[in-house]
Amino acid sequence: MSPQTETKTSAGFKAGVKDYRLTYYTPEYKTKDTDILAAFRVTPQPGVPPEEAGAAVAAESSTGTWTTVWTDGLTSLDRYKGRCYDIEPVAGEENQFIAYVAYPLDLFEEGSVTNLFTSIVGNVFGFKALRALRLEDLRIPPAYTKTFQGPPHGIQVERDKLNKYGRPLLGCTIKPKLGLSAKNYGRAVYECLRGGLDFTKDDENVNSQPFMRWRDRFLFVAEAIYKSQAETGEIKGHYLNATAGTCEEMLKRAQCARELGMPIVMHDYLTGGFTANTTLAHYCRDNGLLLHIHRAMHAVLDRQKNHGMHFRVLAKALRLSGGDHVHSGTVVGKLEGEREVTLGFVDLLRDDYIEKDRSRGVYFTQDWVSLPGVLPVASGGIHVWHMPALTEIFGDDSVLQFGGGTLGHPWGNAPGAVANRVALEACVQARNEGRDLAREGNEIIREAAKWSPELAAACEVWKEIKFEFETIDTL
């Protein structure tokens, strides 16, 4: 062997495989205000100590790999590595732990949810030493939050644009979700809006299909909005879904909505992707459009208790990426959502400062440093009998969206909208008078139905409809 290629054992570095916990498990570490903190629910393989499992998560989601490499000596691992700084057992679960990991801020590109998720929820979720892994929560430090624009407008600006105060906003998803022609679709929108709703909505899978191309839908919906505004004297909107196969096409659709004078567009942020979503959010702020966000595909990621990520993480990511509304579950309807857990991430969407509260699944205190808030949207299997509970649970800063609960009215769309508007106004008035919506809700609805035949008919149709199943994702 020539002298140039000969390797001396006394030189270089010590190769081989070493335990992650020797480098990445640091229980003595004091977290910094600039660290991004993560709480992982870790289920190790049998025989893998929890400290090793937590350290493996920290390593594989930051600077580590499966073996020692000589280029470790060319950087400062102490500066850049993730650290598992605490581990606690999960009550009531065997061999399951919460591992707390701190990441230095320099590991992440500024203003990029895409880069943040690529590291923290990347390859580590397929790591063989773990039976399952779930990201329960993230603490986004102010230093990183300030690199994001966030929601295009926020709650107060939206209320000012719409001139609507003191109550939740009312919406409706047009059904059937697929198959209507553009003209019939516009007719359905008009009937709902003239009946008293604030918004109607494209379903998440309405894009530009053969039965209804996007431009035709936009034109007929615009006609419906202008006609209903003229008749009611109220500002109306329809969530025009701009989601498309490319970012360029998405922006073209948003531009068309703006040119038609529409107040709001919509995006499917998980199927569309965070890069596309942030791009659209920036366009909406620059051009005065509100942005409604649908969370299609979220349950693929967040519904299983042991693997994936909790929706509160996706909600925080959305607030960073940008959106003025996001679907958040209903607690009382057909879609998954435990009350305290749902209220936990609803606060994370709306409020500026949220204290740690493990009873609601909030693992870290979160300071949004004045990043605009997001309106939670309650949608899915709700009807007039749910109105008192929804008003009490979500409060004024929310959107209550009744699809079948409007369009399923026996007298048609407009009477269905009237029934929902009357029920909402009755609940808000009763609450403002000091009545207990949780206890007196049914009585309040019955009283209002005495002078609203539309509400009385709705009450009769949906008096037996309930969705009572055990919640899968619990604390």
Curated annotation (Swiss-Prot):
Binds 1 Mg(2+) ion per subunit. The modification N6-carboxylysine is found at residue 201. Its main location: plastid. The modification N6,N6,N6-trimethyllysine is found at residue 14. The record marks 334 as: Transition state stabilizer. The modification N-acetylproline is found at residue 3. Keywords: Acetylation, Calvin cycle, Carbon dioxide fixation, Chloroplast, Disulfide bond, Lyase, Magnesium, Metal-binding, Methylation, Monooxygenase, Oxidoreductase, Photorespiration, Photosynthesis, Plastid. Mg(2+) binds at residues 201, 203-204. It is an enzyme of class 4 (lyase). Residues 1-2 form a propeptide. One of its GO terms (molecular function) is monooxygenase activity. The keyword Glycosyltransferase does not apply. Its EC number is 4.1.1.39. It is found in: Plastid, Chloroplast. Heterohexadecamer of 8 large chains and 8 small chains; disulfide-linked. The disulfide link is formed within the large subunit homodimers. This is Ribulose bisphosphate carboxylase large chain. It comes from Chara vulgaris (Common stonewort).
